[in-house]
Amino acid sequence: KKNVFNKKVKYWTLERDGKDITVLSAVGHLYSLTPDNPKDKVYFDLHWAPLFEIDKKYKNYTKDYVRAIKKYAKDADSYIHACDYDIEGTLIGYHALKYGCGEDALKKSSRMKFSTLTKKDIVEAYENRIPIDRHQVDSGVARHILDFYFGVNISKALMKSVSAAKKRFLKLSAGRVQTPTLSILVDREKEIKKFVPEPYWLIKALLDGEIEADHVDGKIFDKTRAEEIFSNCENSDAAVDKIKYSNSTTKPPVPFNLGGLQSEAYNVFGFSPKKTQTIAQSLYTAGYTSYPRTSSQKLPESLDFKSIFLQLSKNSEFRTHISALPAKLKPNEGKKEDAAHPAIHPTGILPDKLDKDELKIYELIVYRFISV
């Protein structure tokens, strides 16, 4: 049953195995770091606080989510953490439990782990819950603390330094990832500006109007030499000197992780990485594909390939390619692993309606899954 708290926050109630269950949501992080003493020149003493208390202007909308969690968490017998199974998702749910439900809630909590939003996977994750991964929690906490130390403290120092030199205030920012990345871009831009292009010539022969042959010297940097070769070859007959046959085996591509999907979508469609990730997330939320923010290039043995292919075969275009697959299905996996999630793959559920860009990404994922 769908309900609404305070006219803003949706939540659901249901019964399973004789238990009343309330399903509540967060809206990203509900808690963040803030300094113990805002007047300190450098911030190293920090604590976690609700976002709506830290940023009342832009994050006030999170208040009702925190209130809903606190209200419906009272007197609960147990708690289930079902946020995305990655470091950030784990930290979001952990803080909701610790600060929204209370410290004791952590002792009565379990974790659902799933990589697709199909009914089958959700039920399996519910029935096979695991403990909350404290390593993921610690990793998330450490990242947030380091981001705060670098981002806030160095940004303050940077603005103070530049303002003193320029005799005026400038709002600047630095960050743990942002600043080194900017440095790489600056170095690359300097290389580009220093580059002096050197002209060269390519000589090609068009044979029988169909075959294009390159001169054996490839790039020719001497114009006189290029003109001499061209003059000698112009209007001449070509003779086949040797024919060589060889067989080569091409391995199938590896399954998509997020980076691979973004790279391929850019090469094929010109989509920006952000656009690809947004579309992949919407496909995951709709239950059509698996969790997108994964670094894995591996597909687990537990994945029911035959069932997925059977469902995908309801689409005639997919069926044409699937029917050409060998009887024994063994994917060509890459080296990269992710303990939390497998490589991106279709769930088998065919979309009812997608816009043209969503369809492009969905088909890209499906055809890569078939081809591996």
Where is each model-derived feature located?
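Intrinsically disordered, low-complexity regulatory segments
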Residues: K1-F150
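Long, highly charged, low-complexity internal segments
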Residues: N3-V4, T13, G18-N60, F169-Q281, ...
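Generic beta-strand/beta-sheet core signal
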Residues: A26, A82-D84, L206, G259, ...
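Short, conserved phosphate-binding/catalytic loop or strand-edge motifs used
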Residues: S115-I122, L258-G259, I279-T289
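Extended, highly charged linker/hinge segments and catalytic-adjacent loops that couple domains
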Residues: D133-Q136, G140, D147-G151, A286-I365
